[in-house]
Amino acid sequence: MREGSALPGAPGAAPVPGFLAKLWALVEDPQSDDVICWSRNGENFCILDEQRFAKELLPKYFKHNNISSFIRQLNMYGFRKVVALENGMITAEKNSVIEFQHPFFKQGNAHLLENIKRKVSAVRTEDLKVCAEDLHKVLSEVQEMREQQNNMDIRLANMKRENKALWKEVAVLRQKHSQQQKLLSKILQFILSLMRGNYIVGVKRKRSLTDAAGASPSKYSRQYVRIPVESGQAMAFSEHNSDDEDGNRTGLIIRDITDTLENATNGLLAVAHTSGRDRETQTALDPGLPICQVSQPNELSCAEPIPPVHINDVSKPNEMGNVAVELHTAQANAPEDPVSVIDSILNENNSGNQNDPLLDREEIQDFLNCIDASLEELQAMLSGKQYSFGSEAFSDVFNPELPALDMNLMETSPGMENIANMEDSTEDLGASERETAGSKGGQEGTESCDSSVLFQNCVLKWNFSSL
């Protein structure tokens, strides 16, 4: 039966949907009462055997055998499943009977079928209409959220820039820290190199001086020391100003003199400073002192660089072991540097007191204190500068062994004239006089040699500061 056709036996009836007409014919068919039929009161219809209904009747009327689809169709037309109640409790169905009911689907009332309508999802137009105030409120909230999002984006960008700047600052600080660590390491290496070299700066010692009668010593004179030497030899040290082309060079001559006395068993160590003008050893000696006199050069510049030292070894044909060793110290024009204060102090001390007699112990001590103060001032000046010298460079500069020695054994010493004079004066002295002079001046000469080495080390340090 198609939708819109009238039921049989009901002429002039309103059109009924096809599903309802088929359902009515199915329930009214007496041949299918064992599968589907009316209830006892005629208000509902019951499906007695669900499996047979799905296999036999559904394909015959609805062209499918899906019981679930049939139940969905019933729900769309308003049919409800009847639940059995007993004493207000839902009772479990003992069989597979399913019962449905509808207010207009009753036995003997076929005319009520036209009142059964299929449910249509009606959309209310009122629900679609949105109030203008609500819409404005939603738009305002969206705008506020956008502003907050923009503010968050700006803050995030600022934080990124600050983070980048902080990382750059951290990198700079790390670089500075690394430079400070390197500088500190170099300073420590420099200090350790000084400690390994056994350098002594600013050590105050008491030095005793002995007057030499008949001589005109300079301000800072040195005494003679008689040191026993094997094979009857004597060593003579003299510092003089050689007569070169410009007359400005100064030198220290170390002479090894063979003792010609037959009974002499000890050598003589004599230190003599000669001036550059006459180049002759001062012969005026004290009766208690041996051989020669030590005198300071007229001018001594602490800022001048010290060139390599030449040691000349010359042997005479008639005398064995007669060696002359000369150490030349050239003067050069040093540029102005931070140690000008030290130079001025030393120049004042040297130029103002060249012709004075021998200084006493207190004046020598004051001079050494002045050198100590000058060294401390130099250290304070250099502490504010940064040097890139390694520990090896410092060790090479402050090496007390003077590695730049030039051993020239074929060159004749320019001070060979003093050797004959010193030999003659040695022959004139007696063994008793030499022993007496050696016992008196042994300790004093040792201290004088230590002070000379210390002063040369100071000169080396001042020359390094002018580089």
UniProtKB/Swiss-Prot annotation:
Residues 128-201 are annotated as: Hydrophobic repeat HR-A/B. It is found in: Cytoplasm; Nucleus. Expressed in most tissues. High levels are found in erythrocytes and low levels in liver. GO terms for cellular component: chromatin; cytoplasm; nucleus. GO terms for biological process: cellular response to heat; positive regulation of cell cycle G1/S phase transition; positive regulation of cell cycle G2/M phase transition; positive regulation of cell population proliferation; positive regulation of gene expression; positive regulation of transcription by RNA polymerase II; protein homotrimerization; regulation of fever generation. Residues 16-121 bind DNA. Keywords: Activator, Cytoplasm, DNA-binding, Nucleus, Phosphoprotein, Stress response, Transcription, Transcription regulation. Residues 364-389 are annotated as: Hydrophobic repeat HR-C. SMART domains: HSF (SM00415). Its main location: cytoplasm. Residues 427-449 are annotated as: Disordered. One of its GO terms (molecular function) is DNA binding. PROSITE patterns: HSF_DOMAIN. Belongs to the HSF family. DNA-binding protein that specifically binds heat shock promoter elements (HSE) and activates transcription. HSF3 binds DNA constitutively only when the C-terminal region is deleted. Homotrimer. This is Heat shock factor protein 3. It comes from Gallus gallus.
